[in-house]
C-alpha cells in the first residue's frame, strides 16, 4: 500500500493503540479496553474478525503491543500481567502476574521464553515448562 488511504475500519471492538502483527502478516491483534484480545484478518477490503478471547485483565489502556512468536501471541497489561494465547484460536495458554506495575511490550525469544520490563524497574525472563 503506497497511497496512505484507510482500507477498512471497524467500531466492533473498543481498542486503543495496541496493535500487533502476526509473524506471517495475515492477522492483526489488538487489546481491547476491557478484558479481551481481538484478532482480525489483514487481507481484504472489509474487516473480518477471526476470534476474540476474554483474557480477564479488566479495564486496560497500557500501550504495550501484542507480539507473536512460533504460533503464540503474547501480551501484557498495566497491572503487571503477562499472558499467552494460541495465535490461531485465541485460547488462553497461560497468564502470569509479575507485580502491579505496567509491563512494557514483551519480547518473545521462542515458544517458551519471554523477556519483559516493568515500569517499576524489573527486568526478567519468563521460562515456561
Where does each model-flagged region fall?
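Short loop/turn segments that connect beta-strands within beta-propeller blades
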Residues: 1-3, 42-46, 86-90, 128-129
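Aromatic (tryptophan-biased) beta-strands that constitute blades/sheets of beta-rich domains
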Residues: 5-11, 45-57, 92-98
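Repeat-blade elements of multi-bladed beta-propeller folds
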Residues: 10-38, 57-82, 102-124, 128
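C-terminal soluble interaction/assembly domains
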Residues: 56, 81-82, 87, 97
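Short cationic/low-complexity microdomains
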Residues: 87-108
Amino acid at each position: 500500500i503506497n497511497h496512505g488511504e484507510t482500507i477498512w475500519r471497524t467500531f466492533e471492538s473498543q481498542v486503543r493503540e495496541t496493535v500487533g502483527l502476526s509473524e506471517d502478516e495475515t492477522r492483526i491483534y489488538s487489546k481491547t479496553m476491557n478484558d479481551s484480545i481481538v484478532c482480525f484478518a489483514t487481507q481484504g477490503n472489509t474487516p473480518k474478525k477471526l476470534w476474540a478471547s476474554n483474557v480477564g485483565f479488566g479495564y486496560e489502556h497500557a500501550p504495550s503491543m501484542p507480539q507473536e512468536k512460533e504460533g503464540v501471541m503474547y501480551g501484557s497489561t498495566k497491572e503487571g500481567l503477562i499472558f499467552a494465547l494460541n495465535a490461531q484460536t485465541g485460547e488462553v495458554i497461560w497468564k502470569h502476574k509479575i507485580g502491579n506495575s505496567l509491563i512494557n511490550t514483551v519480547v518473545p525469544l521462542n515458544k517458551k521464553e519471554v523477556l519483559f520490563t516493568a515500569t517499576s524497574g524489573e527486568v526478567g525472563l519468563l521460562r515456561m515448562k
